[in-house]
Each structure stands twice: as C-alpha cells, then as structure tokens.
Design a protein with these regions (language model features):
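Short, small-residue-biased leader/transition segments that mark boundaries at the very start
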Residues: 1-7
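Interhelical loop/hinge segments that connect adjacent transmembrane helices in multipass membrane
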Residues: 5, 26-67, 269-284
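Helix-terminus/linker motif at the lipid-water interface of multi-pass membrane proteins
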Residues: 67-115, 132, 172-180
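Interfacial segments at transmembrane-helix termini and the short loops linking adjacent helices
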Residues: 165-197
Length: 358
C-alpha cells in the first residue's frame, strides 16, 4: 500500500508539473502576442519559409531530442518490469517489492531529480551561446563554452551529491514524516546512489552540448547503447549479487556514467575539446567531501544538544554552504573571472575578497 501510494504521488506530481509548465508557456505566449504582431508588421523584405519547410526543420530538430528524452524516461519502465519479475523469482513477497519500488520512485528518485533538473535548466541556458559560436566556426569559443558549462555544472552537482548522501535520513524524516518507517531504506539508497546526481547532471549537460553543435543523433545513439548495457548490469546485479532494489540504484548510476563517457568522447571528436580534470572534477569533489565532514559534525553536535531534527539540519546546511565555498576558493577551484558568470557573481567576488579568499 505504501509503495502504491508513493508511485501514485510520483506520477501525479509529474503530470501536474507538466500541465502547470504548459499553462505558463501558453500564458506568456498570449501576453506577448501583441508584441509579436507589432514586430512582424515592422519587418521588411523578409523571406517567409513555407509551412512544409518549417515543419520539416522542426521535425528533424525535435525528433532526436525527444528520442533521447524518451530513452531516459523509458529506462524507469524497463527497470520496474525487470526488477519486479526477477524479485518475484527470487522469492521476495509482492508487498516487499511494491514497498521497495515505492521508496525508490517516491523518495530516492524524487530527491535526486531536484539537482538534476537544475543541471538540465543550466544546460539549456548554455546551448544558444554554444550554437552561435559553432555556426560562426569559432571552435575556440565552442571549446571555451563547453569547458565553462561543464565546470559550472560540476561546482553545483558535487556538493548536491555529497549533501544528499550525508543528510539523506534527516531530509527524508523532515519531508516524509508520515512514512518514517521506510526512511532508513530510502537513506541507504541515497547513500549508495547519490553519486548519480553528478553523472546525470553531466550527461544531461553533454546531451545539450552535442545538440548545440548540431550532433543531434549522437545522444540518441549513446542513450540506446547505454540502456542496453544498463539492463544487462541490472540483471547481473540482481541475479548474481541479489542486491534487490539497490541493483536498480547502481544500474541507473552506471547508465548515467556510461552516457557521460560516450558523450565526452563524442564532444572530443566533433569539437576537439579536451577535458580539464583538476579544477573541473578533483577540486569540487575534495571541497564537497570537506563540506560533508564539517556539516555532518555540526549536525551531530546540534542534534545531540537540541534533539530537534529540522533546526539541526538547517543550521548544518548553512555551515555546509559556507564551508564548501571557502574550500572551493582556497583550493583555487574558481577564478575571479569565472565567478563573474555565476548568478550574483559580482557580490560573491566582493564577499570573497573581504574574507581574503580571492
């Protein structure tokens, strides 16, 4: 029952979110309709493309993007079918299977999708600049944009992954207080699979980057290969290691990792981009680990002192943000010029200089 309720909530949330987004887009379009019409009247000597040509370009552009997204989403359906059938063959009860799957989709996936969606939005913001540079045949600017966007995403993804792994149980207890019985299982999934945030964020970004340099089919092919490998890994983990729901968590992490690797190879092939490792991955990872240790110690002390989970977590989260920023700047993970590209970058630079971090 718990698992079924979580699945229903998960699906309902997705549908309502999509409907809300659609209504918002329609609302914005309706507001700007008069502006569009005025702009169209002012235009002179404009060649209007035929409806057939426009639809052809749209279909050629949209179908690879939709296919790539569909493969990402269909992996959940495939996972559910394989997991439930294999788990039944291994002797697990239907109730256990439903609860595990409900916790996986309704708690673990729900939470890791938050930072991944942020990465997806960031990826979309980088594509127009990248596409412009590519069509100007300015490959130096293309490589610079790929490097900047990758570093930007990793600076966000690593602390999110570590934070979710460290504070999985407190977060679940705060958000899902009515189903605390399954929060320990959810936090274990998060501890095992929080690193998927990094891989999914990077694979989502690299999909957008490849589409930005007119390699629309490449992410689709890579996603198809990854989903096949993912299924094989899932079956092996369940049959040989009997990891039950944790096999799904690990297989999904593998799927994203393989996507990252293949997309990275494709970016190198088509743009000549060579990935810098130290500042992009190592320093954010070390800074995030430092953040995780410090913030967990703070949380542990505060919780022992006040026994109020939400207060201990909020204060520890504030310390986490500060400690990560300090560690990242002290380790030279970001330069002043790179910080200017961040939201409120000028303010961050002023504060960092006052604290002698830059």
């Amino acid at each position: 029952l718990v698992g079924s309720e979580m699945c229903i909530r998960d699906r309902l949330g997705t549908v309502l979110g999509s409907v809300a987004a659609l209504l918002f887009v329609v609302f914005i379009f309706a507001i700007y309709m008069k502006v569009f019409k005025r702009q169209m009247k002012r235009e002179r000597n404009v060649r209007v493309s035929s409806f057939g040509y426009t639809m052809k370009i749209l279909v050629i552009t949209v179908i690879p993007v939709l296919l790539s997204t569909t493969i990402y989403n269909i992996s959940g359906i495939i996972d559910q079918g394989i997991f439930k059938q294999v788990a039944l063959l291994q002797g697990y009860t239907q109730n256990d299977i439903d609860v595990w799957w409900g916790v996986y989709t309704g708690k673990y996936k729900l939470l890791i999708n938050v930072p991944i969606s942020i990465a997806s939005a960031m990826a979309a913001s980088f594509v127009p600049v990248l596409t412009g540079a590519y069509h100007r045949d300015d490959m130096e600017a293309v490589r610079g944009q790929i490097n900047l966007s990758t570093r930007f995403i990793m600076v966000v993804a690593f602390p999110c992954a570590v934070g979710l792994a460290v504070f999985g149980l407190p977060i679940f207890n705060i958000l899902f207080s009515s189903t605390r019985a399954t929060n320990a299982e959810a936090s274990l999934m998060m501890y095992v699979g929080a690193v998927a945030v990094v891989f999914y964020s990077l694979s989502t970004l690299s999909n957008g980057l490849l589409q930005g340099i007119d390699r629309l089919k490449v992410p689709v092919i890579n996603a198809a290969i990854s989903i096949v490998a993912h299924v094989i890994v899932l079956i092996l983990l369940m049959l040989i290691f009997r990891l039950n729901i944790h096999a799904v968590v690990l297989a999904n992490t593998f799927f994203a990792l393989l996507m990252c690797f293949m997309n990275s190879m494709a970016l190198k092939k088509y743009s000549g981009f060579k990935q810098e490792i130290k500042k992009t991955f190592i320093i954010p990872a070390i800074s995030s680990l430092i953040m995780g240790v410090i913030s967990y110690i703070v949380y542990f002390i505060l919780y022992k002192a006040c026994h109020i989970e939400i207060i201990a977590f909020i204060l520890a989260a504030i310390i986490a943000v500060i400690s990560y920023a300090v560690a990242l700047l002290l380790l030279k993970g970001l330069t002043e010029d790179e910080l200017r590209h961040f939201p409120k970058g000028t303010l961050i630079i002023k504060v960092a200089k006052k604290c002698h971090l830059l």
